[in-house]
Amino acid sequence: MKAFHTFCVVLLVFGSVSEAKFDDFEDEEDIVEYDDNDFAEFEDVMEDSVTESPQRVITTEDDEDETTVELEGQDENQEGDFEDADTQEGDTESEPYDDEEFEGYEDKPDTSSSKNKDPITIVDVPAHLQNSWESYYLEILMVTGLLAYIMNYIIGKNKNSRLAQAWFNTHRELLESNFTLVGDDGTNKEATSTGKLNQENEHIYNLWCSGRVCCEGMLIQLRFLKRQDLLNVLARMMRPVSDQVQIKVTMNDEDMDTYVFAVGTRKALVRLQKEMQDLSEFCSDKPKSGAKYGLPDSLAILSEMGEVTDGMMDTKMVHFLTHYADKIESVHFSDQSSGPKIMQEEGQPLKLPDTKRTLLFTFNVPGSGNTYPKDMEALLPLMNMVIYSIDKAKKFRLNREGKQKADKNRARVEENFLKLTHVQRQEAAQSRREEKKRAEKERIMNEEDPEKQRRLEEAALRREQKKLEKKQMKMKQIKVKAM
């Protein structure tokens, strides 16, 4: 009976407390305004009521009854707590959604769920990032090309050096027997014979010889192919060319007469006629065949006068030209040699270029590029031809008619040149006069003494009046002559 009485008291207390709590939630607006702190206070009240009820039950006398009542009270309190929690969840779900309260909440991605849901994918490594030889094919090609270029440079340079030394060894005895000095490099003030070639670069070698009668000196230039250049080697596979030996002999003015003459391949003569100043002015006709003198069809002749051709084409010269026609590119004798034509952007030069009496020879080395040191021996007879041409040019002289014709040709060329440059020379003279006047005016203006400045101005005015009077006198004389 006591236990039942205690149970009724607990129910009354719990009902009164819950009824007092739910009175605050009669209006829906109150529920919306209720925040988390209010619910925390509500939970504190529930805990206080639960703790007070068992304290009141402990005062009973029967231990067993007290234990039973206490357990039943705890079970009922737990059931009441669950019912209150369900009631609160239902009330919060029925509340209206406030956008301002949860602003920015939906924008935040759920990183934890996405990390767990994303599947693990294995990415294939690109081919160019794989650690294999195929990934370095470009580097391999570059290194291979660089090594090929270096090897070709070394081999080509050494071959040109061997060819040059082979040529010099073959011709050294002949050169030393005809010239006192062989191989002067020009580094010393006094001419000294070094007895070796002077290397200009990897494919050009020079040799200067002097100390012979009727000539100032002879410059020999060995112009080999650019074997050290890999690109040039590849280009020569499609268009073969030959090594060349160019010889320039500078004659003394008194040891060579006035004439222009050339013999060589037709292609070479056409090119020289366009490029060389003397051939374009004194040999304006097309190259003529040398069949009349027994020359092969591959060779042609350019000459200022027929007398020069007859004098130069003697038996020994024809012998050289006929037997070594495949090695001869051109032979050019001229007293008006000034080199290639001068191309100026602002027009013709104001004076004729300086000329020298020279003999020019261009020989092709046998082999068409595939040259060996032993092929240099085939050029030795051509050096004998050069020595013979020096003596031949010294002995040959024009007759009176030929000399007069040569002088007329040179006067004609000079006159044509002066006509072409007349306007330019007038402009140059006018600019010099204006510059002189400007300098005179500046000198007068810079004078500080007024009296001296006045005298200078009067002197300049008198000079101008005298020049004007001279011009008027010349005009009167011209009118009188015309009458």
Swiss-Prot record:
Highest taxon listed in the record's lineage: Eukaryota
Cell compartments where the protein resides: Endoplasmic reticulum membrane; Rough endoplasmic reticulum membrane
Transmembrane segments: 136-155
Entry keyword Endoplasmic reticulum: yes
Ranges annotated as biased composition (Acidic residues): 60-104
Pfam families (UniProt xref): CCDC47 (PF07946)
Membrane topology: Single-pass type I membrane protein
Coiled coil: 450-483
Gene Ontology biological-process entries: endoplasmic reticulum calcium ion homeostasis; ERAD pathway; multi-pass transmembrane protein insertion into ER membrane; protein insertion into ER membrane
Keywords from the UniProt entry: Coiled coil, Endoplasmic reticulum, Glycoprotein, Membrane, Signal, Transmembrane, Transmembrane helix
Position of the signal peptide: 1-20
Start and end residues of each stretch annotated as Disordered: 46-119, 424-483
Residues glycosylated per entry: N178
Cytoplasmic compartment segments: 21-135
Annotated family: Belongs to the CCDC47 family.
Function: Component of the multi-pass translocon (MPT) complex that mediates insertion of multi-pass membrane proteins into the lipid bilayer of membranes. The MPT complex takes over after the SEC61 complex: following membrane insertion of the first few transmembrane segments of proteins by the SEC61 complex, the MPT complex occludes the lateral gate of the SEC61 complex to promote insertion of subsequent transmembrane regions.
Assembly behavior: Component of the PAT complex, composed of WDR83OS/Asterix and CCDC47. The PAT complex is part of the multi-pass translocon (MPT) complex, composed of three subcomplexes, the GEL complex (composed of RAB5IF/OPTI and TMCO1), the BOS complex (composed of NCLN/Nicalin, NOMO1 and TMEM147) and the PAT complex (composed of WDR83OS/Asterix and CCDC47). The MPT complex associates with the SEC61 complex. Interacts with VCP, HSPA5, DERL1, DERL2 and SELENOS.
Protein name in UniProt: PAT complex subunit CCDC47
Taxonomy of the source species: Eukaryota, Metazoa, Chordata, Craniata, Vertebrata
Gene: CCDC47
